[in-house]
Every structure is written in structure tokens, then in C-alpha cells.
Amino acid sequence: MTPRAGATALALAAALLSATEGCGPRPAAPPPGPPPVPLHLAPACDLAPAAGLEWIIDARPRAIAEVPDLIPVLAVLVPEARFAAFAAAHGGVDVRQIAELCVAKYKEARLTIARTALDPARVERAFADRATHAGGRSIDVVNPPVVRVWGEVHGEAQQLLLFGREAALLEQGRAGPARAAEAFALGKLRRASPALRGSPLSNVAEILGEAPVRAFAPGPFEGDSAHGLGGLMRASSAVAASARFAGPPAKIAVRLVLTGAWGKSAHAAASRLAAAVHVLSESPFGRLLGVDRPVVAPLVTGSDDALVMEATFDGAALARGLHDALDAEVTDIIGGPARAPR
């Protein structure tokens, strides 16, 4: 190496050393975030606790809305304007796109659980806009984010839980069911069973089978409800009903199940249920719904532990009747103005 080349190399090494010393040690990498917490969100009704339950509805709105023959039926029951009003008031959530919807009524609260793709920030803003008295906000889980916000809406306590972008839960009324639902979602209530997994609804759910719309009520039944269906409700441990599409143009197959210790009285109880169904079909309300003109006449069977009624009805007639009879209630649930009196 020549003296000139050696001097050049020495100067370059000195420059590199100086630059290294000036930069100091490399900054430490940020610590990793908390590991993801597994969420158990399906089926939606597996988040509904059993304690204090009065009734529960399990529905698959998207599956219903995807049946072409049912689109005009839905339009009669719930006009497009009401779907739009609900979406505008709830952060863009379209009821018809909800994969699973569970509504559970308790003595002093109501729980609505929707499993659907959503924008959590938008849904949270919509809740804040509806609230007439702000409460608070908590991030219960960081990864994935489980956010809880609460407040009052026109004097009613309400609480919203957002499970990432996958599901939302709304509690209305006295606090309690939402906490249990969150614990189910986080897998913290291993010794407890959700409403449809424990007695007495697990048995009636198994007999009823799967359907896009199902409704359940646990016994014992007292007061006016005990006199329902020819007095059979008093002896029932649970009652459930389902509805499903049964073919064009808009046939709806309905199944009704009453569980109880019917034993040797099953045949007589089945005859009593058939008579009660006939009385209902011939009543003003039954005629309004068109159940006095079934597509397939009701068939009632009985066994030691269950009474089962199956029939098929005209879905268009059912929708028209329900629209006329329950218009105010649908307005309360979906939102939007009620129709003008006729």
C-alpha cells in the first residue's frame, strides 16, 4: 500500500468511527402488544345468559333476505325507509346483512346481539349521538378491541359493546345481562350455560330444530300466559316456534313445540292443542294473518315429553296481517315514522 492510499484508508476509518459514535446505540424495538384474546361470538345466542330470561329470538336476517321470493314479503312487513332509518341511527348497520341476530328479554332488561361486519367507530359515534346523557367508555380488551360505552337514551340506561369489527351488543334497561354476555364471549363462564344450552330450553331447541327464525320462552308460565293454547301452557316447561321458507311463491312452514311431562296424557293434550290452534285460526287475529286459510293444514302430534304442531301458510298474507296488526311495534324496533292512520 502506498503512503497516499494508507492515509486515505485511515481517514475513511476515522470518519466511519466518528459517525458511529455520533449516532449512539440503536433504539430498542417497541415491546410487542398483548397477544390476541380469542372471542367466542357464534352463534350469537350463545352470549345470552339464562338467568332471568323471559323470552329469546334467534334469527338469521341475511339468510332470509337472500331468498328472492321473500323480498316482496319483507317489503310489506318492513318498508325500505325503515331499514334506511335504522341504518342511519345505528352506524350504517343494515339489518338485512346481519348474519345472526339474537334478542333476549329479561325482567328488567333487553339484550340485542348482532353478528355482522361493522365499522366500530361509526357505530360508537351513532350511539353517542342517540344518547341524551353521556356515561362513559372503557376498553375492556386491547387485542382485538372490545369497547364498552354507556349512557342514557331518553331516560333509559343503555350499554353498547363492540367486539372488534365482528359483532355488537346493546343492553337496554338494568345492567347485568351484558356483563354475562361479555364473559361468555371471552370464555370466562365455563361453568354456566347460555340460555339455549341449558334447561329447559336446550330440550325444546333440539326438538324444534334449526330454522332462520326461532323464538323460545321458558316456563313456568303463570297468570294470563298460563291460560294460553287451551291451558296447555300451564303444564309446559317451555314453548318454542320456528318459521322457514317452504317454497314459492312465499310459503312459510311454521313449527310449534310445547315440552312438558305429557306422558300418558300426550294424545289428549295433542287433541287439545289442535283445538286451540283451530280457535286461534278462526279468531279475528287469525283471519287477519290468513292462518284460517293454510297452504298445508296444521298437523299436531304428541309424545311423552313434547307436543308438536306443523303447518304451512301464505307468507304474503302473514306479512300483510302482521304489518296491519303490529305496525307500531315494528316502528319501535326498526325506527322511522309510523304510517298515517287510514
Where would I find each of the regions flagged by the language model?
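Bacterial N-terminal signal peptides that target proteins for export
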Residues: 1-12
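C-terminal motif of bacterial Sec signal peptides marking the signal peptidase cleavage site
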Residues: 19-22
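Long, low-complexity, Ser/Thr/Gly/Pro-rich intrinsically disordered segments that act as flexible linkers
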Residues: 27-139, 159-160, 244-250, 299-302, ...
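An internal, short helix-loop-strand segment that often contains or flanks glycine-aspartate motifs
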Residues: 64-96, 134-251, 264-265, 269, ...
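Short, conserved charged micro-motifs
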Residues: 66-68, 119-125, 262-271, 318-320
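Short beta-strand-to-loop capping motifs
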Residues: 113-118, 172-173, 256-262, 311-313
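Short amphipathic alpha-helices in soluble, non-transmembrane regions
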Residues: 125-131, 269-275, 325-326
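A cross-kingdom marker for long, charged
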Residues: 266, 277-342
